[in-house]
Amino acid sequence: MIITSLLDTDLYKFTMMQVVLHHFPAATVEYRFRCRTRGVDLVPYIDEIRDEVRGLCALRFTDVELDYLRRMRFIKSDFVDFLALFHLNEKYISIMPSPKGNGEIDIVIEGPWLHTILFEIPVLAIVNEVYFRNTQREPDYREGRERLRDKIKLLGAKPEFADCKIADYGTRRRFSKVWHEEVALTLRDGLGPQFAGTSNVFYAMKHDLTPLGTMAHEYLQACQALGPRLRDSQTYGFEMWAKEYRGDLGIALSDVYGMDAFLNDFDMYFCKLFDGARHDSGDPFDWGERMLRHYEANRCDPRTKVLVFSDALDIPKVMQLYERFRGRCKLAFGVGTNLTNDLGYVPLQIVIKMVRCNGQPVAKLSDSPGKSMCDDKAYLAYLRQVFGIAQPVGDDASQ
């Protein structure tokens, strides 16, 4: 089986799941899969994907895994007790050929948020690995190792980048589980203190790495249906996060409604309360400059705040961003596909996004055209109107 542990996922799934347990236990949601890479035929692999998902749903947390989670300062004991009883249920996920007949597949995850939130990352990893083990039966790991060594050499060659740290954010789009583990260990051994850790909880536990993550888009999207008023949903999401974590895990995701809406909502209170913000779409250099100006305008010293960059990064881009912002703020970089799926093959651009919560459409209004995803055009238009956001050229989020 591809997934052999329920910890083989990203940390932010557990940090969000704890909020769901404590504040939104009755919420119901729907997620949908999309492959953004054109011309990819996934239909022949449906049976394999289903078999792997069936194996995923048979897994439970072990005592060792639960003890590991319990030792995290921000994980509460009642949440670990809940996880001791938890397993993913196959009845909440369906995997079918798309009626479009173009090689696409429809993966729909629908049910209680508390019982479906852990599907996304392992299912994406399953789709990726099933696809590549069928299309690349003799993987060119030699090429992958050479590319990885070049990245390590590039980052470690210049003394002025000694404080530039990267983290592995590559679980969902990794080439394979085996390759992902090799990448993480190679980064640990090759970069030393320049390797900040990994978003993958299983490898963090197994190899004594630092697990990293706070919140994802789905959390703030769900707040569109869970909060008191749509316009205040982002503020509501940040307030509920602070209510749960009391200042811990203080990295705010900035692009669910675009940068302008984020800055309008991220007032002096949030600037002081949260440790920093994460960039995941749009121009990262412009975003960073705007964040620094925003902190200064809200009487916060930017040098005490963390800017996290995680959008389609590679090592040269990391180094450019580090050169621009070093000394002006604290910096963190999460690199995904470019680390865990760079063996010379075209990686799949696949996502699973929340599209409904409590029967109501929810959406992400990204700073990057094509990254939004909503199956209700009327709601998307209404959401843009409420937040005063024009539709980016080339963005058809319902496709």
Swiss-Prot record:
Q: Does the keyword Lipid biosynthesis apply?
A: no
| EC id | 6.3.4.21
Give Gene Ontology CC terms: cytosol
PTM notes:
Transiently phosphorylated on a His residue during the reaction cycle. Phosphorylation strongly increases the affinity for substrates and increases the rate of nicotinate D-ribonucleotide production. Dephosphorylation regenerates the low-affinity form of the enzyme, leading to product release.
Keywords associated with the record: Ligase, Phosphoprotein, Pyridine nucleotide biosynthesis
Signal peptide from the UniProt entry: none
Q: Which residues carry this modification: Phosphohistidine?
A: H217
**Source species, domain of life:** Bacteria
List the GO molecular function terms: nicotinate phosphoribosyltransferase activity
Gene3D superfamilies linked to this entry: nicotinate phosphoribosyltransferase
According to its UniProt entry, the protein's GO biological process terms are:
NAD biosynthetic process via the salvage pathway
Pfam families attached to this UniProt entry: NAPRTase (PF04095), NAPRTase_N (PF17767)
The enzyme class is ligase
Q: Which reaction does it catalyse?
A: nicotinate + 5-phospho-alpha-D-ribose 1-diphosphate + ATP + H2O = nicotinate beta-D-ribonucleotide + ADP + phosphate + diphosphate
The record's function comment reads: Catalyzes the synthesis of beta-nicotinate D-ribonucleotide from nicotinate and 5-phospho-D-ribose 1-phosphate at the expense of ATP.
Q: Which family does it belong to?
A: Belongs to the NAPRTase family.
Designated name of the protein: Nicotinate phosphoribosyltransferase
